[in-house]
């Protein structure tokens, strides 16, 4: 079914109303080939299926005139046209699947040439796309239409179409290849599922801006990846990209917003915003009750002069496991291309707010990084949660391997735990190298045998980020680490911990500031109680070989305990360096406990001791009382002044030293006259008569038995004999 025009004007509107519509290798479409507009398409049905390469399309192609006539002979007016809108309402299921040779099933509005593409709007109970099926709007030199999907039930995208050695994913996307802006994608669904390489994306490859993506659902699931050409994995993903080989292109990435009760990203799936040009990448905003990433990735990245976008997550619980990654960074596209532009944009800020739990496990990481051979600044990491757990080799890292500075790590929590070997909070700067490409060519080509490597390589200095933690309780144990470090001639940042209650380092837990050749960083800790156990350590260490000013360690605490081989140390190769350890009282109270095998030492490498400044608290004088004057030396004499008085039924001796009286073991205190209620006599009332106990005895099992017979009863229990009492015999 087709409406088209080869001339100017409007091709006409196409409207289809039916109970069930099924297309198999068939099309419904409108098109125009010169200036004008292809008509709108409206479809209303109970169910709609597009099978085996079938399509619904509205298309305009003005560029076809260039193939027929010489470019200069085609007036600009004839180069302009727009495609129509597509509106689909399906009461039950809309399904796109199957291919026909190299054609996949699709719904599209597109313009080839100059002009704007139309919008696509779909309402259905269920939507299913598979086998490389697509919903698409695109334009070359015009604005791209929007895609709006409103699905009351499940919406699924699965798999890909394989043509030759390439795989084309099932997708929903808007794309601009020219100066126009890309359209937005808006999705409302009960449950959105993307699997096996399926994709939702907006992209610009020129000066136009990429569109935004907004998803509202009860549950969002992204799972799996495919191998393109059997070599490179292509993840299941939701992404907005600024992608071009022309670095001067200024198109901006769109915002990616997800709002759902539960979001799961697993088995290589991704949520991303990327830029390869001067335009900034889009940002990612996620609001959910529960976010779980299992070997999944959430990423904003810049590979060009543009800046990476921010990542902002608001949730009750956030769990990253099995190598999952949350990252924002700056990377040089080809670090081995020495003649490339190293002016790479800044990394984005990562913000995670988890009102209940933020957990990283099994090698997962939150990472803000700048790669080698770049001149860029790292983004900051801000984490805010009630409980934060970093374990199983997981890490929160801000790093810079280029020329700029690393970002800071700010963490706020009521309860923070860093558990396990390689689990860490880390801010590091390693600097980089600047290479003169001309001299490098001479060196590796052998044309200049006298070339000196130092003449073409310039070491660069970077500055590490600061780690700032504000928590009620902090525990670092089982090899866990909080660390700022630097390599090359770079300098590390500082560690600043504000702990309201207690700081625990246990079983090789470590807080460190270290440098290879530069100055050391400082460690500043305010905590009411600090305890180091089982070979745990606080360390500020500068260069082991060069004269440097080492970092200081400053502790403000009420109680400091070093036990079982733990250490607080600084070291410096410079006799005039820092290497200070300062311990201050918390609110005028300070207690320092140190086991014999533990160490507080501020000695440099030349064994020149630094300053250990322990400020004594201003304590009031205490009167010491002689304990012998207030403790009794004769407990028996003291006991004679106390005894029990018999005022009830008996059963207790007069005092702890005496025995029970012989006869008075029970007294009946009940009134002698008890009213008897009137009742109807039954046969059971006449069968037996209660007899008052006349005595009692102890049976062989040690139980006391009340008995109506007294002939064989023992008159009394065996009575204990009173013990003698003396100061030397007080144990009963």
Task: Give the location of each predicted region.
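Extracellular and secretory-pathway beta-repeat/beta-biased strand scaffolds
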Residues: 1-732
